[in-house]
Amino acid sequence: MSDQDKEAFPPQHQDHQPGREAAMNPRPESSARSYTPCGKLEGRVALITGGDSGIGKAVAIAFAKEGADIAITYFDEHEDAEETRKLVEQTGRRCIVMAGDIGDAKFCRQIVHSTVSDLGRLDVLVNNAGEQHPQQRIEDISEEQLERTFRTNIFAMFHTVTAALPHLKEGARIINTTSVTAYRGSSHLIDYAATKGAIVAFTRSLSQQLAARKIHVNAVAPGPVWTPLIPASFSAEQVAHFGADVPLERAGQPDEIAPCYVFLACGDSSYMSG
């Protein structure tokens, strides 16, 4: 058996987007048990969209370990969100969870209001929620899918940032999750890749506009990461070999990505924006 034929994960598929972490085998690694915090975000408040599972969950836990109170949003994965809330609270930090459609501008405004109302302030905004729907041909991407993908992946960032800005003071951070597909492209994720490219341009442009206000804007572009979106997007056979085609020959785990967000959220990245 060649390396390309070896299974990276047990074959599995979920019919519901954005997927449920509780149904995955194996569960993604999010808790970063070996991570040693040093109070880099002490007293801060972070709002993380899509924070119930995957990268967002790992970021929420890492931020909490560094001293931040956390607000997370999710779609309808109540079990995952409750688990994340408990893990954050185990660090001694506060956590609120908010269910809704991030593609709805009204919800974007509401989550900012609730974060400030319940946690007292907002220092770090992580725009992380996203969705993807593979299609083999561009002709198979419906108008509904196209609009939905853009609403969730990029329009939501505009709406959430606009709502957050009145509360973000000098030194605040905005961190957007893009993807390696923004640079490499993807033949079966054309609409998704287009939104991720838009996020790169959005991040660079917004960083220039907010520089005078001393608000830092950056993005993280992960490669293949083992999150619920994977079994919810691809066939069982595709999932079995997910991540095997990259140089490290495996997918990343969420808690291997989270330290990038910690770096961008704290003073260590004081000379980085855009």
Predicted regions and their residues:
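C-terminal helical subdomain
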Residues: 1-30, 212, 219, 241-272
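Amphipathic alpha-helical dimer-interface segment in Rossmann-like NAD(P)H-dependent oxidoreductases
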Residues: 61, 113, 117, 152-172, ...
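The beta1-alpha1 cofactor-binding region of Rossmann-like NAD(H)/NADP(H)-dependent oxidoreductases
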Residues: 78, 99-113, 143, 255-256
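Conserved mid-core segment of classical short-chain dehydrogenase/reductases
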Residues: 104, 109, 132-147, 166, ...
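Catalytic Tyr-X3-Lys loop
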Residues: 139-158, 175, 199, 248
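Active-site helix of classical SDR
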Residues: 161, 195, 203
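Residue(s) in the substrate-gating loop at a strand-loop-helix junction
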Residues: 179
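A glycine/serine/threonine-rich, flexible loop-to-helix segment
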Residues: 188, 212, 223-246
